[in-house]
Amino acid sequence: TFTQISAQEPPNPCGPASILSEALANNVAEDSRCFELRFYTAEPAVNGKGGIDDLHQRFREKQITLLEQHGADMIAHWQRLDNPNTVVWLLAFRDREHRDEVFATFRADPEWLALREKYSVPVNRELFFMSATDYSGIK
């Protein structure tokens, strides 16, 4: 089975300063995208199935491509060295509404459902939402 434990639901707003509350918009760029930092920590493999290697393979095989097809900008992917069962992603979207649309269509995609079934990896997922500062080189 596929299980996810979400550390932060519902997520905070993110994106350009104009769509944020005054308290959140301070120092945020007007042209900032919505950035999402994701930590996926895989549970150990059981009987040779699941685990971090299956998670990496799922990402390699199709998950990243599918997210891009649905509109996500996949900025970078990292392997944590202090916890090798954790993969870190940085994604970007036009704004929070766009992010929610991307994930809604992605989660309903039959290719994603088949891929998730093929590589059923229980994970702990942590999500952090950010907006670029007005002096950031990446927006």
Task: Describe the predicted segments one by one.
Residues T1-P110, S120-K139:
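Short S/T/G/P-rich N-terminal loop/turn motif that feeds into the first structured element of a domain
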